[in-house]
Amino acid sequence: MPYYTKLGNLPRKRHVQFRRPDGALYSEELFGTEGFVGPTSTLYHIHPPTQVSGWKNLYTTKPEYVESGVMRMRHAKTADMKPKGDPVTGRIVLYGNADVEMGICTPEAAMDYHFKNGQGDECLFVHYGTGTLFTMFGTLKFGPKDYIVIPKGTIYQMVFDERPDDGSDNEKFAGKSKAEMPYGRFLCFETANASHILPPPRYMSKQTAQFLEHAPYCERDLRIPEPPLTFDEAGEFEVRIKARDSVHSYIYNYHPLDVVGWDGCYYPYCFNIDDFAPIVGQLHMPPPIHQTFEGHNFVICSFCPRMLDFHPEAIPIPYNHSNIDSDEILYYVEGDYGARRGIEIGSISLHPQGIPHGPHPGTVEKSLGKKYTNELAVMCDTFRPMFPTKAAVQIDDESYPESWRQDHHAPLENRNGAHQPKPSAAPATPDQA
């Protein structure tokens, strides 16, 4: 996290006696990264956090990638993916590489345990649903369009609010009933290379780690943990820990969220995509101006509603471009994406490095003169190829790579009302020319 904060009760100095009301000492835990030289927080537990038992391996989490030798455009339609599992076991990895994994979760059950990802940072983007993330650092309320950044090692439980049975909220869930989407849906990113998901360094002061004036968001936009913080309960509490590409079960004889106070720079937080302030320009701006977070070898960007380019001859949609060094993945949240046709809410497009891509036929002329876009999308650019899983292939639109061929579309009108002709089936011969 970029700045220092604290919550709950703390002693005046670190590493000194801090006693409970019964006279016993609270148990101090330094919770940090990079071997004592990275961001850390210091927590004070009612019970020693080392008192665990009953450890066992539950299941493997290593994704199985397919079609690694096939390089083409991809379009996965996730809107109709069936509910599965809980907010952890229901996560379905769709694309990934050695640096980051990306997937969708539509849980059908509640978590009856707590979870710790000891393998990587998580960034969850909530598309539908509301709820509460209970963590060892306190409580985070979440709702639609929230990014939830959860640093590696955080113990938490993700609890969605119950939906009514009468269908009165179907409109808030893309028209889907409680049976079709019992709790909600979120997009998930997880680091696979032990790096951390952080704001881009160029947004931050090198002297103070404060957000700079040119940054599209700042500290005021971040929601940090709040009370309730401490759960002082006895019993058997399962904590599942992801590490070594497996999930392991441990048993605590007390509630794992027994922290009475903490301070530091390492903690989870929420950021709503509507609080991202887009940067606009006279001519079309490149994707890096939409960057929101980054990890090693990947970035996460937010394409938000905004004013379009204001040069009198501007073309307000992206130009054709080649991803020479990166793959580009877009998750479409809502609104109209002017450069694409056939895209729907919940679509995920993958444009691999080495293949030029850009506006679909006819969309450039159609965009001329537009002053505003209502698109909302989350993008992940990776600097190593992203590969699909079987789950992604099952929902893949195989016709998508051909969608740039103009003869696959009805002609569009240009600004003068004339139809754009379809290309000839074959090139003209010298006699025909």
Where do the protein language model's features map onto the residues?
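Jelly-roll (double-stranded beta-helix
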Residues: 1-433
